[in-house]
């Protein structure tokens, strides 16, 4: 469990430093951040968020459990100090869906940085019947996507504790109905984030969107022994992993290209240059981790 907390903490540290430091190259040239941003994000606090949010519930859309957990998100944000917007919407499959959105005002009120994670959950029957939902499912969605919700709450709290006014206005969005409801559904997923996008006021520029979905992994990652999971499925994880010894994966048949390695090296170098050398973040924050 400690390694899981460590992975969450490392991901969150990279996320917060990347987002704060890379939004405007003008900021990079004209204003240096302090060597250490105090307070720092807490991996332990993020893990507590995850455990408290999950609470043994199955958060499928249009259920009491879903409504209870989104109310919990709202209450947590209000305790932190945010004014919270409830974005209600309906679809063919959902009569009572709701996004929860918190705002951190910036110097530019019409230029937004949006960070999102979905609070709903779904599960399907295992292969070969993928896409079939079943009434006895009680998945808690701890990975998909309570990890995103937990870390987004931690980021929102850290930004308040930081005590500065960011250049951009920040929106922390907790989306409902992102998950596809299965092969019997009359519509696809992504409804919550779509509702948010369709209601962005005219004249507002969304400068950046970052999505936290299934956020945080331990290493090494062992591919599951499922007939539908080939080694190619893990290319994305490997592409940006911190490991230097790739033999675990190459010995298991995953083809790694020089382009993949070069991209990871290039990204690492850019992070070090911008976040550590120019903005002064601790070097341990600046790692390509996932």
Can you describe what each PLM-predicted range is?
Residues 49-107, 278-290:
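A non-catalytic alpha/beta surface segment that caps or lines the substrate-entry region
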Residues 45-52, 64-84, 147-154, 169, ...:
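Extracytoplasmic/secreted proteins, especially bacterial periplasmic and envelope-associated proteins
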Residues 49-52, 85-87, 100-103, 112-116, ...:
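Structural recognition of the beta-strand scaffold that forms the well-ordered cores
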Residues 244-288:
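Acidic, glycine-rich loop-and-strand cores that form catalytic or ligand-binding grooves
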Residues 44-46, 93-96, 104-109, 163-168, ...:
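Extracellular/periplasmic catalytic domains that process cell-envelope and extracellular macromolecules
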Residues 1-37, 175:
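Secretory targeting signatures
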